[in-house]
Amino acid sequence: MTNDMTKGAITPLLIRFTIPLVLGNLFQLTYNAADSIIVGKFVGEEALAAVGTSNPLMTLAILFINGMCLGAGILVSTAFGAGDTRLVERQVSTTAIAGTVFSLAFSALCVILATPLLQLMQVPADILPIAVNYLRIVFAGLIFTFFYNFLAATMRALGDSKSALYFLMISSVLNIGGDLFFVEVLNWGSSGCALSTVISEALCCVLCVLYIRWKVPILQLGRRWLVFDGSLLRKTVSYGWASAMQQATVQLGKIAVQAIVNTMGVSTMAAFTAASRIDDFAYTPQQNIGHAMTTLMAQNRGAGKHDRVKQGFLCGMRIEGVYGVLIAVVCFGGAPFIMKLFVTDPEVIHLGVRFLRTVSLFYLMPAFTNGIQGFFRSVGDLKVTLVSSTINMLFRAAAAAVFVLMWKLEIEALPYSYVVGWVVMLAYELPLLVRYLRSHEDEL
């Protein structure tokens, strides 16, 4: 099933496309929390620590996989909007072949080097064997991670975000069920958790392929898929590399801020951890709206409907603005209740409320930065998104260091450091946006 976003009222199209993306990400966040609870409750803190310490390496691999999938998705959206089904087939085929080779090579490398990589990360010796086993099992199934993300990204690029949501929900339910079976029933520990992840993603890959054969004729498997286009691969890599580096930059920025938070005491650390999870729930839909804008504008750009590209951008920014105001009201007014869902300590709740009420006052800023990034992704200028994200995180980390380490400010210093990053990010993006719109005024 595909969704031609070059026709119809734009605002309803964006909303209908965004809702499954939001639900999918919220479902993923909820699943991640459940996964940690199962390991921590039924295995113990050592297993939980082993799983946690393996996450940076897993995140690195997934960042590059997602980057390639996002890059390919933008190109697929553009080709689909132009009605060039042959180009869609070549793009999908080329990405599938290249992704398979990369996944298998990276998987083999990480399985072989799991022990020295974890030792390099200073993993304690008492949990090293647990972490090695967990990491090797997960990386052995990296090919399924690639195909699962690739097929879901391709369906979204064709305008079908609902199917991707359904498969994510199926994968998450299978994963949680597998965790309970392998960890609680069979007592396989963190290795059982890793095996559950691989099996659930493998089953979802099979379901995705069956669905595509049944519902998406443009992507039906056949000999024509065995086409490799070097020029398309280079273009995909250029798009994907920028996307992967952008996401990596965001992760590094979060790590830097966390390192500063770790100097502020246990109560502040706990409050920041809980409040950051809430902030993630609030922030994720803003990203999803931006990605929906990318798909809609890329399809219309490919179709040559430049008036709809501009309309899509303006409608998307209005949706971002409305959501930014609504979520700010919810987080500011409901901060005490929301914090009590995560923690019971009065001091931690008080600190978390101060964080949430401060950061929520500025939620319009990331709403607009995500909308602008969605625009630049749709026109293929991913360097802007990479540079702006890098600037944001550099200034955020630097501001946090100044506010906390030099000026000795309390927890409000952290959301204020976010604001510094967003302000500088907008100061970089807005002139480029105005320049692009003026230089392409005849088209838009």
Regions found by a protein language model. Name each.
Residues 26, 30-49, 118-125, 181-188, ...:
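Helix-terminus/linker motif at the lipid-water interface of multi-pass membrane proteins
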Residues 69, 137-156, 164-172, 193-208, ...:
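Short runs within selected transmembrane alpha-helices of multi-pass transporters and secretion channels
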Residues 39-59, 126-130, 190-193, 232-239, ...:
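Interfacial/gating helices of multi-pass transporter permease domains
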Residues 60-63, 175-179, 204-209, 281-284, ...:
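Hydrophobic transmembrane alpha-helices of multi-pass small-molecule transporters
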Residues 48-108, 145-164, 271-335, 366-380, ...:
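Small-residue-rich hydrophobic transmembrane alpha-helices
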Residues 16-35, 137, 148, 171, ...:
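Transmembrane helical elements of multi-pass membrane transporters/channels
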